[in-house]
Amino acid sequence: MAAVAVLLVLIGAMAGWLGWHTFRDTQTQRLHDLFLQTGRQGAVNLTTMNFEHVDADIQRVLDISAGAFYEDFQKRARAFGDVVKKTQSMTEGTITEAGIESISGDSARVLVAVAVKTSNLAAPQQLPRLWRMRIDVQKIGQIAKVTNVGFVA
C-alpha cells in the first residue's frame, strides 16, 4: 500500500513537472511569435507609405513604436510627410524573410529582409530594392513595440 502511495506521488510530481515545462515552452513560443510579428509589422509599416494618405501611414509607424525611436520618428514625421507628398512618393514593403537574432528578457532583436517597390514623380517605375533591417522590439504589457531600427549592410 505504501509503495502504491509513493508511486502515485512520483507520478503526480512527474506530471506536474512535465506540465510546468510544457506551459513554460508555450509561453516562450508565444513571446517569440509576438516579437517576430512585431518586427515584421514594424518593417512593413516603415516601408509602406503613400503620399495620398501619408499621415495615416506615419501614424501606423508611431502606433507600433516606443521609446527613443518613437520620439525621434515623431519629431521628424511632419518633414518626412511633406517630402513624401511633394515627391508624390509611394512605397510598398513586402517581407521576404524574418527571424529572431536574439532575445533577452522582455526585448528582442529581429532581422527582417524586405523587398520595397518605389515610385515617385521623378521615377514612376523602379525596380524593387532589397533591404535588410535590424529591428529592436520590447514587450510592454501584453503587446510589443519597435524601439529601434537599423539597416544591415
Locations of regions flagged by a protein language model:
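Amphipathic, hydrophobic N-terminal targeting peptides for secretion and organelle import
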Residues: 1-24
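Short, low-complexity Ser/Thr-rich regulatory SLiMs
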Residues: 9, 102, 137-141
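Short beta-strand edge/turn micro-motifs at domain boundaries
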Residues: 109, 125, 130-153
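Aliphatic-rich helix starts adjacent to a transmembrane/signal segment
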Residues: 25-29
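A short, acidic/glycine-rich surface segment
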Residues: 44-45, 118-123
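Surface-exposed, charged secondary-structure patches
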Residues: 88-119
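A mature extracytoplasmic/lumenal domain signature
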Residues: 77, 112-116, 150-151
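Core segments of small alpha/beta cavity-forming domains
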Residues: 30-86, 90
